[in-house]
Amino acid sequence: MSMVYINIFLAFAISFVGLLMYRSHLMSSLLCLEGMMLSLFVMLTITILSNHFTLASMIPIILLVFAACEAALGLSLLVMVSNTYGTDYVQNLNLLQC
């Protein structure tokens, strides 16, 4: 396994640990999710290009589209929560609270 793969895997792992540690604020969670998606995109692209999988060359673009949709939905949710409650705490997203 080359150093590039190790670095990208470490970026994914650090983003995942950040998602587990900083899950109280919505903005921190969204940034960690974007880091995870970016590292997955780079890893998938490098793997497909190095192995010459021509049939699977569309998969990283589809992953990037899903990441953009996730970012747009996350930011719209962040704006809605911050306008309603004044903070970006994830606990405000619980619909079972009164």
Swiss-Prot record:
InterPro entries from the UniProt entry: NADH_UbQ_OxRdtase_chain4L/K, NUOK/Mnh_C1-like
Disulfide partners: none
Any single GO BP term: ATP synthesis coupled electron transport
Listed GO MF terms: NADH dehydrogenase (ubiquinone) activity
Cellular component, GO, one term: mitochondrial inner membrane
Source taxon at top rank: Eukaryota
Keywords from the named record: Electron transport, Membrane, Mitochondrion, Mitochondrion inner membrane, NAD, Respiratory chain, Translocase, Transmembrane, Transmembrane helix, Transport, Ubiquinone
Bilayer topology annotation: Multi-pass membrane protein
Swiss-Prot/TrEMBL catalytic activity: a ubiquinone + NADH + 5 H(+)(in) = a ubiquinol + NAD(+) + 4 H(+)(out)
Location in the cell: Mitochondrion inner membrane
E.C. no: 7.1.1.2
Main location: mitochondrion
Family: Belongs to the complex I subunit 4L family.
Protein name: NADH-ubiquinone oxidoreductase chain 4L
Gene name for this UniProt entry: MT-ND4L
